[in-house]
């Protein structure tokens, strides 16, 4: 309740146009009840919406299909004014097995109920703005002048139920590129949507990357492991075709040395995967439901094999 009241004080306003319940889904209805129902918060939020103190009440979803369906069943009771979901042309049909729910399903279910949608991760943590060379080449063949990021933004922006698209911009160039994309917005054709959601996403799905979007919710690690940094380095090597498969591979020595040197440069030794003890503290914080300790063990095993020449 204090956090809720402080929001109005910090923002120096007597009302909020959009109030979002963050990160619902994980833990199911039991977690939702503990956070918002049993303490009376949902009753208060509904009452404040009636008074106009909150204009639109919604949620951001992080979970699997069963948890999503449970939350939508509450729509008749609470009337969600908007829902924030992760949606991009890769997750449209290729969401990983742990989250178990494609963005296509999330969108369709919300569209049926006429619930406006806010999009998070339209670039999947930057992955769609900097894909593997083979993917980038295919996109450039279609439109040499279009930025790689613009394809991803146009994909999510071309669906009619979308209320707004979030974009984590770091540099001035990002802002300028986004303005070019959304000013005089060009809707994708059905063929272009299929091209991105099936062909391009299919190529990307063939790369064994880790579905980390660099949100850093898993940090800090109590043992100092740079979890997002390790995953980012590994994914970049996968996308650039720099992962070694066996000692008999062409350019084995060159690729082996390149990975080990770049790993040490990207991640200091005291923060590398070998320092993970499997405490699992990070698991509950990951919105992508990545099995973080397992992936760190896999990377560490790969590094050790490279060092020992035992692939």
Walk through the language-model features, giving the residues of each:
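Structured C-terminal cap/extension of enzyme domains
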Residues: 79, 105-311
